[in-house]
């Protein structure tokens, strides 16, 4: 609740530049007015504590995406790092159905492999891996296999490129644009360009980046332009994410 209060305060302080969105129409309104959009999200379903009424309360507060697990077990499921073979718990399946009904996007990043496949099985709406890369290019537990990428595409979802160097190239701590482009190209080749989005995770990574914050994203766009068409770059940078938001939250 304190974090949400902080979010509200930031929105109020910068209302001329950015406003909270609760539905796709809010995003369209902000675009028309030249404003940025901010969507309240939760990383880790631990605050739910097995209670659907808390999910309803989060929705009423404006939450529109929940990363189901983080780096530890919770009432929904298990993290990939320690329990890759354990899927969604019964409450996780129940909560997913309620999220689909309400219009809250389910995020599989950090979730166990088995939990990912349960999302494929049980979700009635697209879901996302908000900050995960291609395991075929960097074999780390947090990345997605080619089969996962194809399954994500079949659900109409996206994976957001994670800018953490260790997720892009093994044994490095420097994030290069060319490595991000390489992962984007692989994901597009395997699952279609409609499955690629930007995840960044600027506030959650320890790597040194070729560009340090979102002000440097034009560097990434320039790199993407070398291997994708202009239409495809538009999809990767914003179009795919907007489609999923529209499909999921209405």
Feature locations, PLM:
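Short, solvent-exposed loop/turn segments at secondary-structure boundaries
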Residues: 139-141, 171-174, 208-212
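Short acidic/histidine-rich active-site segments
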Residues: 163, 191-212
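Mid-to-C-terminal alpha-helical segments outside catalytic/metal-binding sites
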Residues: 212-250
């Amino acid at each position: 609740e304190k974090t949400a209060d902080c979010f509200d305060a930031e929105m109020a302080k910068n209302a001329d530049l950015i406003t909270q969105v609760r539905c796709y129409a809010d995003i369209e309104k902000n675009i028309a007015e030249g404003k940025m959009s901010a969507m309240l999200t939760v990383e880790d379903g631990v605050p739910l504590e097995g209670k659907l009424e808390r999910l309803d309360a989060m929705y009423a507060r404006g939450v529109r995406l929940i990363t189901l697990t983080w780096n530890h077990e919770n009432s929904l499921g298990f993290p990939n790092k320690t329990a890759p073979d354990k899927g969604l718990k019964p409450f996780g399946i129940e909560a997913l159905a309620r999220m689909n009904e309400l219009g809250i996007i389910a995020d599989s990043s950090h979730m166990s492999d088995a939990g990912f496949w349960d999302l494929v099985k049980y979700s009635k709406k697209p879901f996302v891996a908000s900050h995960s890369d291609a395991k075929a290019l960097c074999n780390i537990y947090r990345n997605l296999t080619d089969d996962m990428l194809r399954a994500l595409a079949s659900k109409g979802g996206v994976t957001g490129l994670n800018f953490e160097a260790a997720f892009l190239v093994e044994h490095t701590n420097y994030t290069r644009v060319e490595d991000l482009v390489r992962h984007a190209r692989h994901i597009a080749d395997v699952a279609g360009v409609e499955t690629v989005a930007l995840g960044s995770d600027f506030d959650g990574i320890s790597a040194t980046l070729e560009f340090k914050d979102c002000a440097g994203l034009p560097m990434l766009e320039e790199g993407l332009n070398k291997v994708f068409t202009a239409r495809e770059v538009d999809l990767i940078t914003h179009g795919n994410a907007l489609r999923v938001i529209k499909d999921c939250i209405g």
